[in-house]
A protein has these predicted regions:
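Conserved micro-motifs of the catalytic ATP-binding
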Residues: 1-4, 40-43
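Short helix-loop "hinge" at the ATP-lid/N-box region of the Bergerat-fold HATPase_c
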Residues: 58-60
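Short conserved segment of the HATPase_c
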Residues: 91-103
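Detector for a conserved hydrophobic position within an alpha-helical segment of the HATPase_c
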Residues: 123-124
């Protein structure tokens, strides 16, 4: 199927649930920060949860202290961004270009089968969106999931 069915939903409640699930993987010194307004967007809850949970759990693997943040910013009438930021070790430059390639041999960065980020990227596409690494961010790692509800 090309795209997921989208439905209008309150993302604040959804993100609270996702963060609660992800927090079970956080180290004790890591603070979970949720900054998501009470707005509705058209999305697919299950698909969105798969991406955000993966990114938050991956952040948890590489963050020993500080915080992991999940926020949402409305960029325009039909565009919003979910931003996942951590204060972890960051991603080595030589690996950044391979992150979204299936089976890139970066086992220290992803859990399990190496399919994580490429799969998340495909799910993002099916949600009318894109997933990318913010290369400008230097205090850890920041991923941006941009969704269009058109």
């Amino acid at each position: 199927e090309e795209h997921y069915p989208l439905k209008d939903m309150n993302i604040n409640a959804l993100c609270e649930t996702i963060m609660e699930k992800a927090k079970t993987n956080f180290k004790p010194e890591v603070e979970a920060v949720l900054n998501v307004p009470r707005v509705n967007i058209k999305t697919n809850a299950e698909a969105l949860e798969r991406i955000l949970l993966y990114l938050l759990r991956n952040a948890a693997l590489h963050t020993d202290n500080g915080k992991i943040t999940l926020e949402f910013k409305k960029r325009s009438a039909h565009t919003g961004q979910f931003i996942i930021t951590d204060t972890g070790t960051g991603i080595p430059t030589e690996i950044k270009g391979k992150l979204f390639k299936p089976f890139a041999e970066i086992h220290d960065l992803t859990q399990g089968n190496g399919l994580g980020l490429p799969t998340c990227s495909l799910i993002a596409y099916k949600l009318n969106g894109t997933l990318h690494l913010d290369n400008e961010y230097k205090k850890g790692t920041r991923f941006v999931l941009e969704l269009h509800d058109k």
